[in-house]
């Protein structure tokens, strides 16, 4: 129990907090009393520890992470501030986050949103991801991205409809898909997600933060502001 409290104080109050714990008679019953009176300390401490561990994973893969598949970018392709999103077209939470991303782009003209196609929810997710990269190859990624989410669950019909809406050259797209052109990039995205501890969608990286789930515009805007200040 004592080491948990030491960890909590160290994480939440810095090393000074841990030192205070170590050099004052704050053990035994005092520790128990403190934790009983402040039950939120341990979950918060573990949350901070988890975030720090994930932050440490970002730097070794940052260049790879922020490098988009050519054309698979929303917002400003030359932007100096990068938001990375791991997404799956079968993910309702990803669909619900589309307006949040558009709002962020409108408010941050230097924001580059790098989309990492991360198909994990159903086999058709992979088909949609391949078509999305084919759209990127033809300079029509944003149009396909929006159309695919608007059409709902990916299947052969909705994927084809989204591709038509985006104006893809279907013969060219299918040829690239059949050749396996995009599969190495999808595998790389899965490897990146694993390295960062991302197991679901949407997953976000901005600055030194890894954020899980559909957290909403306000939380993402806050993370962008923090990245801008760092």
Identify the meaning behind each predicted range.
Residues 2-123, 178, 184-200, 222, ...:
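Extracytoplasmic thiol/disulfide redox context detector
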Residues 119-201, 205-230:
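Cysteine-centric redox/oxidoreductase cores and disulfide-bonded domains
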């Amino acid at each position: 129990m004592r080491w948990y409290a030491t960890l909590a104080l160290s994480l939440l109050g810095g090393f000074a907090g841990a030192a205070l714990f170590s050099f004052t008679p704050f053990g035994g019953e005092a520790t128990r009393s403190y934790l009983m009176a402040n039950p939120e300390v341990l979950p918060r401490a573990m949350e901070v520890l988890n975030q720090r561990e994930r932050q440490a994973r970002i730097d070794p893969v940052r260049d790879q992470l922020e490098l988009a598949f050519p054309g698979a970018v929303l917002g400003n392709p030359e932007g100096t501030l990068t938001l990375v999103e791991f997404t799956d077209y079968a993910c309702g939470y990803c669909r619900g986050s589309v307006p949040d991303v558009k709002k962020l782009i409108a408010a941050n003209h230097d924001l580059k949103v790098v989309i990492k196609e991360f198909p994990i929810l159903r086999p058709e997710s992979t088909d949609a991801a391949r078509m999305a990269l084919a759209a990127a190859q033809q300079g029509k990624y944003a149009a396909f991205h929006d159309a695919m989410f608007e059409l709902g669950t990916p299947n052969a019909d909705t994927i084809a409809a989204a591709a038509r809406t985006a104006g893809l050259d279907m013969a060219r797209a299918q040829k690239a898909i059949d050749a396996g052109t995009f599969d190495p990039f999808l595998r790389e995205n899965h490897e990146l997600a694993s390295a960062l501890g991302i197991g679901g969608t949407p997953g976000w990286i901005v600055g030194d933060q890894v954020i899980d789930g559909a957290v909403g515009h306000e939380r993402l805007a806050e993370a962008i502001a923090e990245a801008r200040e760092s």
